[in-house]
Amino acid sequence: MYREVSQLLLYSNLGEDSILRQLSGIFSDWAHGECEKPVLVSRIYQQVKRLLDLATRYGFNCNLWHDYLTFVLMMNENSFSLTCERVGASDGSVNHFAKADFAVFKRLFDFDFAPIEQDLGIDCFTVLENYTAIPKKAQMYYRTVSEKVRALSAAIAGAKDENEIFDLVTAHYRDCGVGMFGLNRAFRIQEDENGSFTLNAINNIDSVLLSDLIGYEPQKKELRQNTEAFVSGHAANNVLLYGDAGTGKSTSVKAILNEYADRGLRMIEIYKHQFGLLSQVIAKIKNRNYRFMIFIDDLSFEEHEVEYKFLKAVIEGGVETRPANVLIVATSNRRHLVQETWKDRDDMEHNGDIHRSDTMEERLSLAARFGCAICYVSPNRQQYHDIVRGIAARLPDGLSLTEDELLQAANRWEIRHGGISGRTAQQFINYIAGLQT
């Protein structure tokens, strides 16, 4: 194995701590007799455990070795794979090196573990190549990643040579992308102590669609039109969904992500205290072949908070314009995002700010930077009943209540639980359905 791995060129950036690199070192030590057998077995088991952990996280099955190698190909961001992501496979000298690397992966796919297993008295690789995973709920692993990895893994296993692997892998890069953006649709920002960050995939995204949101047809239409323009490469506006609590603003954003993910839409969730990282985040994604929504949920600022300045700088562009593949999407219960007080309107009570009204105007102008502002208001009584009936109709086992009983109970529920809203209706149906189980 170490001979094969040493021949990689474009895909040589595996990382010294990668499973493949570590196994390569172990096999080299075994071949040269440079390590005692019990130590080799222990080192192998450490990497097998890492592979099992990876398989559990991403839902690998059947042949974990093949799935792992496929995962490496999918995740490896190099000059070749990133170019294929942007423009697909094209004629060029680099294809010679790519096919040489794919020939290496073909040999790794067909690698014979029997000699080392027999010599060390182990069978772990045989088990990995004939693996039956414990059934798991979709929320426990990255289901969309699992489906893509296993499909490509099976196709590569059936490929006769590096030319077929080249076609399969480059088609994946073109259609799905490379790295974490190719395998996931939503991410959150994880800061580290050095002031930098990583993007971590979000596993349990709600599978909601806009059609699941009852009512709000004008709002959904406007959001869909703006998103359609965005993913089609046309001009689109930053979006502010504002209005009453529990009316489906955040749900609409998740739904639009699900509906357009197959066309390259991705979402990065950011919190207010992370706004100082916005320029770094945009620099990381601006050259990728995806459309990114930077999502801010429940956006608002108190009088003393100044983080809005980072957001304004990104929206307005400054020296560097906002990339065409980045859109700011925010939800808020406020139409004016920065809190305003009566004192703000009086230049005489400036507390050191000679032109306080100018300062106030600067703060309150943030909402105007969102060219697409969509208002969500609480439903009236009839609309609330329509939502209750609609959600109840989706229950697979239905409800034992008559319609009149259902609506009367819904009215009593909203009085005690925050008033009329779509969220209240959903919580009510959850409660009623729970009583029947």
What is the role of each PLM region?
Residues E349-L364, G371-H385:
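Conserved AAA+ ATPase "SRH/arginine-finger" region at the nucleotide-binding site
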Residues A373, V377-T437:
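C-terminal alpha-helical "lid" subdomain
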Residues I205-V239:
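Pre-Walker A (pre-P-loop) alpha-helix and adjacent loop at the N terminus of AAA/AAA+ ATPase modules
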Residues N258-F292, S300-H304:
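AAA+/P-loop NTPase substrate/partner-engagement loops
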Residues H234-V253:
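Walker A/P-loop nucleotide-binding motif
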Residues E302-G352:
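Conserved catalytic/switch belt of AAA+ P-loop NTPases
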